[in-house]
Amino acid sequence: MNNWSQGSTPQGSDPSPYAPELGSLPDGSQSDDHGDTVNKTGTTTIGITTDEGVVIATDMRASLGGRFVSNKNVQKVEQIHPTGALTLVGSVGGAQSFIRTLRAEVNLYESRRGEPMPIEALATLAGNFARGGPFRAINPILGGVDEEGSHVYSIDPAGGVMADDYTVTGSGMQLAYGLLEQEYEEGLSLEEAQSVAARAIESAVERDTGSGNGVFLAAVTGEGVDIQGHNDFDAVI
């Protein structure tokens, strides 16, 4: 079980908002001289709700400029709430800063009110920060469990927050969505959802150069968040 208040994040520097491998379409007018030197997660990240909890899956690759693999073991999902986790999509530095900020707000809320922040409120807060903060082009997935049930939200760089039964962000999203549309069905168990999510990540890494090297799976329940990394897809499919 991960310690949500002290989770580690991969190292990176301040991002460029222009990056072809981001989970959103880039605007060429925003490019600068750092596009090939800033670590970006490229990425395929997936969130699936079940009656038992939430499954979040990500690949493991970080790249420079979308052309050079700078890290093969990046943990792109982090615990930010006692029963909630967030993915890293976009520039590593911006995603790290976003996670640190949300963790601080979750801690502050709990210390003031004596109870965990509701996941819907956390999603709204994350959207506000994405729109108004200095985090630049990020497109994470938030998954969590509270008294209202299981929740998955995608958060776009403009601050839009969308709830769904399952969602995908990142450069491999079209490939992963193709498999999820076929495999997802209501009533999946947590274990079945993990297998579906892992297969969708595997489908994306076959063709998307920004995704690869394995899968991290996070199981989010009312008991907490458990994150495990797997270099071999066969171990979890």
Curated annotation (Swiss-Prot):
Q: Which GO terms describe its molecular function?
A: threonine-type endopeptidase activity
Q: Which InterPro entries does the record associate with it?
A: Ntn_hydrolases_N, Pept_T1A_Psome_bsu_arc, Pept_T1A_subB, Proteasome_sua/b, Proteasome_suB-type
> Where do the catalytic residues lie?
T43
Instruction: From the UniProt record, list the residues forming the propeptide.
Output: 1-42
Query: GO:BP terms for this protein?
Result: proteasomal protein catabolic process
Q: Where is the composition biased (Polar residues)?
A: 1-14
A single Gene Ontology CC annotation of this entry is: proteasome core complex, beta-subunit complex
Q: How is its activity regulated?
A: The formation of the proteasomal ATPase PAN-20S proteasome complex, via the docking of the C-termini of PAN into the intersubunit pockets in the alpha-rings, triggers opening of the gate for substrate entry. Interconversion between the open-gate and close-gate conformations leads to a dynamic regulation of the 20S proteasome proteolysis activity.
Where is this protein found?
Cytoplasm
Q: Catalysed reaction per UniProt?
A: Cleavage of peptide bonds with very broad specificity
Enzyme Commission number, as recorded: 3.4.25.1
Keywords, in A-Z order:
Autocatalytic cleavage, Cytoplasm, Hydrolase, Protease, Proteasome, Threonine protease, Zymogen
Q: Which NCBIfam families match?
A: arc_protsome_B
In the record, the note on similarity to other proteins reads: Belongs to the peptidase T1B family.
Function summary = Component of the proteasome core, a large protease complex with broad specificity involved in protein degradation.
What is the annotated quaternary arrangement, including any partners? The 20S proteasome core is composed of 14 alpha and 14 beta subunits that assemble into four stacked heptameric rings, resulting in a barrel-shaped structure. The two inner rings, each composed of seven catalytic beta subunits, are sandwiched by two outer rings, each composed of seven alpha subunits. The catalytic chamber with the active sites is on the inside of the barrel. Has a gated structure, the ends of the cylinder being occluded by the N-termini of the alpha-subunits. Is capped at one or both ends by the proteasome regulatory ATPase, PAN.
What is the name listed in the Swiss-Prot or TrEMBL entry for this protein?
Proteasome subunit beta 2
Q: Which organism is it from?
A: Haloterrigena turkmenica (strain ATCC 51198 / DSM 5511 / JCM 9101 / NCIMB 13204 / VKM B-1734 / 4k)
